[in-house]
């Protein structure tokens, strides 16, 4: 059994917020679970070519926008899943941080960070 508290986990500044990584590849479960904060007013160009990701919003509001421009509002109680390694924009509204519980499969190593300075979608 694995039991972890927030103050015991790896915290990574992923580019536009913090990712608290509760489960990692080294845990041997095959997936990662994170508590991720997206800073208010930020827009991130993201794509996971080696991972599938599902995110459940627990705080804040924003939107996830497909590469084709289709926008989906995010608010507490909303889940979105990137089941096709979708390139997307993750946007946190101006008034507050967006907080998501995320699951990645396969698992992350734990040290991954995005390059948000690129004109391409950042990936890992």
Segments and roles (model prediction):
Residues 37-38, 49-64, 103:
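Short, conserved beta-strand element in jelly-roll/cupin
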């Amino acid at each position: 059994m694995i039991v972890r508290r927030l103050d015991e986990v790896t915290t990574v500044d992923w580019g536009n917020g913090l990712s608290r990584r509760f489960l990692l590849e080294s845990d041997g479960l095959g997936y990662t679970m994170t508590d991720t904060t997206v800073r208010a007013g930020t827009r991130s160009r993201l794509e996971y070519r080696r991972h599938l990701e599902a995110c459940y919003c627990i705080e804040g509001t924003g939107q996830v926008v497909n590469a084709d421009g289709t926008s989906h509002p995010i608010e507490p109680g909303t889940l979105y899943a990137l089941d096709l390694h979708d390139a997307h924009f993750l946007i946190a509204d101006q008034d507050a941080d967006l907080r998501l519980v995320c699951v990645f499969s396969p698992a992350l190593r734990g040290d991954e960070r995005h390059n948000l300075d690129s004109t391409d979608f950042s990936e890992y």
